[in-house]
Amino acid sequence: MATPRLFKLKSQVAPALSGPVATDLPYARVYVDTGVFHLDSPYDYEVPEKLTHVVLTGVRVQVPFGNREVEGLVIERVVAPQVTNGLKTITKVLSIHPVATAKSLELIAQCAQRWATNPWDVIRSAIPPRVAAVDKTFQPSSSRVAKSNSQSDICFRAFEPHLSAHEQVTSIALESIRKGSVLIVAPDERDIVAICAQLERSAQPYLRIDSALSRNDRYANFLEATQEKNQIVIGSRSAIFAPLAPGATVIVFKESSPDLYEVRSPAWNARDVAMMRKSIDSARVILCGYVPSLDVAALIDSKRIAYFNSNAKISVKAFTPVDASLLPGRIFTDIRSNISQGPVLFVLPRKGYANGILCAHCKNVALCSCGGRLHLTSKNADPACRICGALSKQWKCSFCTRDKKFVVSRGIERAQEEIARAFPNTPIVLSFGDVIKDRVEAKPCIVLATPGAIPQVVGGYSAVVVLEGLSYFSHDDLRANERANELFFEVAGS
């Protein structure tokens, strides 16, 4: 027989007394992480007298909400609350360092209204997670910004196609830092690293804010950015919300890049947020890239955005492929002459080995049982479905039952085989997918890369070959044309 347990009374937990309410501005308006989408309004809380000196605008606090304790962000201190009955008291201050200014909180509110979302969804992207160890050691600076850019305009600067985009955006930043602080928003880590390297060559200090850093470094740099000093801040798309000094310059690098769109709800994009900062922060906004996006092009046509470009000519040769061959016969002489001078870049649209398979006998498309097309990730790999990922180890044509495959829509690995046969004894470097090369040596070789994975080389490439050029325009979306034009001009500056 089981031994009965002793009966224990459940103790009642009473809330601790918070003490008297502050005499000066006794209430705080707070954004609360409710976890409920439609509860998106700020809430008023009483401020205890013992916390009155640390409950400031932009400070993280812990507040009671329902039957639990949640995080909140102080918007402002007020004299009278919106609702007088049933007010609760701020439990404690999580961090004494403000992580938002009145202007950045206004920006968060406008973004939440524009994209119809809970403000905390924007705060989650705008402010890095708190690190207690950094909070304890961070020392706020007593000096504030001394310069302010008097211009508050917005423009698009088209890069020159024969020059590196990273060098050109660095030049714009160094020109703007003389007039006030600068924020550079770049699409991805590779662009951030390249721009940081250019700033270091110019002996220009900067603050970096992106997810590639450790949590400690990212949070420490973010706190330093809130000090509103004359400095260059660079980061990925979330850095667009970093607090800025009045009259700062915001530079959106490659503004047409899809990486500048937030993948989580509410799917804001850095370009539109930067344009909102023009009116909120009196910021000067510079959108830059080789080709404006369709959105910016419409604003340029309507004269709402100024457009600046410079005339430049680059040597371009077009070759028509014959019989679906990868390399036209007339291109070999140009490639051989340029290989002797340095690395030659080949840009291909697809990774893998073959993006499509046909039956070699009846030429019907090889399909998975789910209806998806089969492809080859490497030469000796089994056909895999592009939709469900299932492998077809014993594939046979569903029409003629034969098993001989004919590969179409070549990927970078199959292109490597053909180029290696065309240029024997020439070193070939691959950069795509999970094997991206950041740099290659400036010596005779062939570099095969997919868009977005092009390695840098000191002095640039001796020649750039864009293979299957028309395929870049054949994507089934309206932005295919703008992406293709941006890519062609970008590789020209490589």
Feature locations, PLM:
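C-terminal boundary of histidine-terminating zinc-finger modules
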Residues: S315-F332
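Cys/His-rich short segments
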Residues: S340-A422
